[in-house]
Design a protein with these regions (language model features):
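A solvent-exposed, charged loop/short amphipathic helix patch at secondary-structure junctions
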Residues: 19-37, 127-137
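C-terminal accessory domains and tails appended to enzymatic cores
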Residues: 201-298
């Protein structure tokens, strides 16, 4: 039986979301409302997953807020039995992992609010592209969802359930066909979707998670190393590395590559705590290793 459950939560794949709040720091009431409602939508889907897990006999459920600056889930609206990992993503690198404590005795991974990888024609706000090449000649194109599945696989942990847009759910099921899933919306384009009701989504997540955690144990999705990782991004400061570092495991290779992404370069392991963590305040451009030709990654 699955006793200790780890949830990774993103926001773009929740039912009812079709685009973010505005990114120009506009301080309008509309922008405030967009951000507030998206946070509520995610928090309630996480609560639904927690209810399903506890109904299936879980003893501990921890959720990692993995969207943006890691401050999207609203703590005061959380199920009281949940524990929350939140905060600045770049400081994970000092721990050597993208998901803190995942290797500390957890039995199953749940994915909530997942979105499709960059380049997906029918994905809601698709972004992030992680390319993996193994020494054995295998290649993978991962989304953030399947990336989390692979990190869990390095810890021997299976992914039991995923909720998100249809494109990312189908992508994840192609790698782990036995897990339970919920497609919260069908996407026509990056900001045009047909969504189910958030109320229905929460009901289906709760029942789906309970069913998933009552089934026989699945095999983890594991990428066999050694391997190397490249990260694609339309931001020209994120280079497509010519010779990424080869590491023994996927998780190690991912961390090695993330250390070269501009906004994943924290100034200090121990920050002074008096600066609001605006992720746009990154290393000055003069310190970025941009090729003289100005070439961008594919």
């Amino acid at each position: 039986m699955y006793k200790n459950i780890y949830i990774v939560a993103d926001v773009e794949g929740v039912a009812g979301l079709v685009f973010y709040e505005y990114w120009d720091k506009e301080m309008s009431l509309l922008n405030h409302e967009l951000l507030r409602r998206n946070r509520v939508l995610l928090t309630e889907e996480v609560n639904a997953a927690a209810r399903g897990a506890f109904a299936a006999g879980a003893e501990k459920v921890v959720v990692h807020d993995h969207h943006g600056a890691g401050y999207t889930i609203i703590p005061e609206l959380m199920d009281e039995r949940l524990e929350l990992i939140h905060g600045r993503g770049e400081q994970h690198l000092f721990l050597g992992t993208s998901h803190p404590d995942l290797d500390q005795g957890f039995d199953a991974l749940l994915l909530i609010g997942m979105h499709a990888k960059a380049g997906t024609a029918e994905g809601c706000t698709p972004h992030s592209y992680i390319q993996v090449e193994t020494a054995a000649g295998q290649t993978y194109a991962l989304s953030e969802a399947t990336m989390s599945m692979a990190i869990a696989g390095d810890c021997g942990i299976p992914c039991a359930f995923i909720a998100g847009d249809r494109a990312t759910v189908e992508d994840a099921l192609s790698l782990c066909p036995g897990m339970h899933s919920l497609a919260t919306k069908k996407n026509y384009a990056s900001q045009l979707t047909r969504t189910i009701s958030p109320i229905l989504s929460r009901k289906l997540i709760e029942s789906g998670v309970e069913a998933a955690l009552r089934q026989d144990r699945l095999q983890p999705f594991k990428i066999t190393g050694p391997c190397k990782v490249r990260i694609g991004d339309r931001n020209p400061q994120v280079l497509w590395p010519e010779k990424p570092e080869t590491c023994a495991s996927f998780s190690e290779a991912l961390i090695a590559t993330l250390r070269n992404v501009p906004w994943y370069k924290p100034v200090s392991e121990i920050d002074d705590g008096w600066r609001f963590p605006d992720r746009r305040q990154v290393t000055p451009p003069t310190q970025w290793n941009i090729p003289p030709t100005g070439e961008k990654q594919p």
